[in-house]
Amino acid sequence: MSSYNYLNEKIILPISDTLLGNSIYKDLKFLMNSQWWSADELKEYQNEKLRALIKHSYDNVPYYNELFHSLHLTPEDIKTSKDLYKLPILTKDILRENIKNGKIIAKNISKKSLLLGSSSGSTGEPLQYYNTRDAESFNKACAIRGWYWMGYRLGDRYIKLSQNPRPLLKNIQDKFNNCFYISVQQLTDENFREIVEKINNFKPLFIRSYPDPMLFLTNYIIKNHIQIITPRAIATTGNILFDEYREKIENVFKCKIFDSYSCEGGANVSECETHNCYHSSMEYAITEILDNDMNDVENGCLGRVITTDLHNYAVPFIRYDTQDYIKKSKEKCNCGRELLAIDKIEGRDSDILITPSNKWLIVHNFTGYFEWIDSVEQFQV
């Protein structure tokens, strides 16, 4: 760790936490230790957090109090993650309705302290919900830990490519974080030329982006025979990173991609340095991977992601249906971490076709087929 990295992690981050009321530094320090816990230690931590969450939800959240009574359950009936099957799945529609009527918002948390969060809306109407400062800090710390797996340290020079407008506070934070933010709202050849110029001039150690803009930028570089600097790594998130995308981007930038996935409700997953799998942040949420009958899938199988956020006490997400599918790893990762190992992020339920014989076809199946047919420029299933 350089002196500049040390300054950012050990001094600037704690000062920022104090000024903004966050706890990212404390949480990151905890997570850098807990990532090496045994599976039993991780599950024990989850169960302890789950019991506290269930009691809080029963005592302070009308929706869950009514739900428990209707099921003739008490908080004592949910002692470990294995007991979660006793509770129904929380769908986005149920959540949206009960946020609107206020029944799923905790009564014992000041409205002034609530933070507004929102899903991307990629599958329809965005979901707006509330979060606590502590939960948001823990989530950010999990994301930073994932970046650390690719060799990043706070203060390292990086470029972020994104479509979102950058508010003043974010611009100020970018300066402190050594981040050069580049908007990719308009993807034209002229914009790509400017982006390449900015990347080459800034010489980032890391690049963060959605997969699609990185692919389009890569295609532009290939088409125009342009020289591009080689960062240490590229971090992608936000939509599916197809194998052919990864291969093409890595070949052009001559570095590895570290993919990640997150979703409202506690899903926070990052690819580790072995590139053999992703790891779910078990300290942040309980992740169930279920089949169509809502039973646990076997290792190596595809399943629906159901999450229980162990930290958001404002609007508890308990057995939340993310509508995403992931493939559970067959084996433990050889990185040594016993965090839940995931082979692939497969996409939304709207991206999966189930045949009459109950065979699941994901977007990858069609992409891999049509990429070899030159006459097909675009396709939609």
PLM segments and residue spans:
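Nucleotide 5′-phosphate-binding alpha/beta core
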Residues: 1-118, 125-139, 144-149, 153-156, ...
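Short, solvent-exposed polar/charged micro-motifs at secondary-structure junctions
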Residues: 86-90, 167-169, 268-271
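Conserved AMP-binding loop of ANL adenylate-forming enzymes
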Residues: 144-186
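Active-site glycine/GP-rich loop and adjacent strand/helix microenvironment
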Residues: 2-12, 16-41, 48, 52-55, ...
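Conformational gate/switch positions in structured elements
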Residues: 123-125, 154, 263, 325
